[in-house]
């Protein structure tokens, strides 16, 4: 299946197909120097399949995990590219999850003022969400995605077969972002999670269609695209304060969504899905600590936070909440009846 992302200054295809990783040479011009950026968590067989199709390529491997989205790894990748005499006509292919895509994309955006970037996401989380849209970034200390850019890929290749090597926890972590998409935009997508057997292909495809539609309307997150931050305001705070070595990103987003689902019947429906996915509960937290992270989040402006509220599955409300109101939400907690 091929979807097109049509933007004002740049459009690109998304290929969603089993065994698509075997066809990289058909989807990407490979007759140039290519840096393949991956991490230690990606099985070598996927990386090697890509490399075998790119005759003049080299592999850059970063340590697995969020801590690699940092200036040190960013600098090392730039040095590696310089040592291989890469030019503006060369390209980067990311083979990995969201961390690899974010870091590789930011390197592509800044090396020689920008070179071609291709993304082959290998996790559910990156396939349903982060690989599409052009948001690339690195962290600074415990502040997530604080340094970054908008740099659209030239092509995205999504092969559900590569998910077979992931643990169930990693798969379910990624599905949280797909569920988020359904809660704000499409109740049918939510209903896919309530089926006895999860149809991963259907969930991925519908999530990408929804993400594509939002990005086409608001490429640079000036208005509509903010809805994709549902669950991230408090989710990022939990991840930064407690979760970088404990919880996965999607798990934190799932926690964050609970604070802003305003219908108790819907919240119970969502909690039933969480139980099915074996997601962790919101940990005990210090309100002041989380509030500190919220106030430094890039979604905050002056003394308010642009917040997404959900009262009915498939729809949303955007509301500016004061820091005081966020404090009250935190004090109330996610499970209050």
Q: Predicted regions span which residues?
A:
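A glycine/threonine-rich phosphate-anchoring loop and its flanking beta-alpha core
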Residues: 13-15, 21, 29, 106-195, ...
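C-terminal charged capping/lid subdomain of soluble metabolic enzymes
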Residues: 11, 176, 268-337
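Active-site segments that bind and position negatively charged phosphate/pyrophosphate groups
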Residues: 192-289
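ATP/NTP phosphate-donor binding region
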Residues: 1-91
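Short glycine/serine/threonine-rich phosphate/pyrophosphate-binding segments
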Residues: 99-106, 127, 236-237
């Amino acid at each position: 299946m091929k979807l097109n992302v049509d933007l004002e200054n740049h459009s690109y295809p998304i290929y969603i197909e089993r065994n698509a990783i075997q066809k990289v040479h058909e989807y990407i011009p490979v007759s140039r120097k290519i840096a393949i950026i991956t991490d230690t968590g990606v099985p070598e067989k996927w990386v090697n399949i890509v490399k075998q199709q790119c005759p003049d390529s080299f592999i850059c491997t970063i340590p697995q995990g969020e801590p690699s989205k940092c200036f040190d790894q960013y600098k090392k990748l730039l040095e590696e590219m310089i040592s291989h005499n890469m030019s503006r006509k060369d390209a980067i292919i990311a083979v990995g999850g969201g961390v690899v895509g974010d870091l590789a994309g930011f390197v592509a955006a800044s090396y020689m003022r920008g070179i071609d970037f291709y993304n082959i996401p290998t996790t559910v989380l990156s396939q349903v969400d982060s690989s599409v849209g052009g948001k690339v970034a690195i962290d600074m200390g415990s502040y997530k995605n604080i340094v970054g850019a908008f740099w659209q890929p030239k092509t995205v290749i999504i092969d559900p077969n590569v998910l077979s090597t992931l643990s169930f926890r990693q798969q379910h972590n990624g599905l949280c972002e797909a569920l988020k998409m359904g809660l704000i935009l499409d109740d049918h997508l939510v209903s896919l999670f309530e089926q006895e057997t999860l149809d991963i292909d259907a969930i991925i495809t519908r999530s990408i269609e929804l993400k594509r539609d939002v990005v086409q309307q608001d490429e640079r997150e000036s208005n509509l695209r903010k809805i994709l931050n549902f669950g991230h305001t408090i989710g990022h705070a939990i991840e930064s304060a407690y979760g970088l070595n404990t919880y996965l990103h999607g798990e934190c987003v799932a926690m964050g969504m609970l604070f802003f689902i305003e219908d108790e019947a819907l919240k119970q429906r969502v909690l039933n899905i969480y139980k099915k996915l074996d997601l962790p509960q919101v940990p005990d937290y210090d309100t002041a600590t989380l509030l500190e992270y919220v106030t430094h989040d890039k979604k905050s402006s002056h003394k308010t936070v642009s917040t997404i509220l959900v009262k009915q599955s498939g729809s949303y409300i955007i509301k500016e909440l004061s820091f005081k109101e966020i404090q009250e939400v935190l004090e109330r907690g996610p499970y209050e009846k």
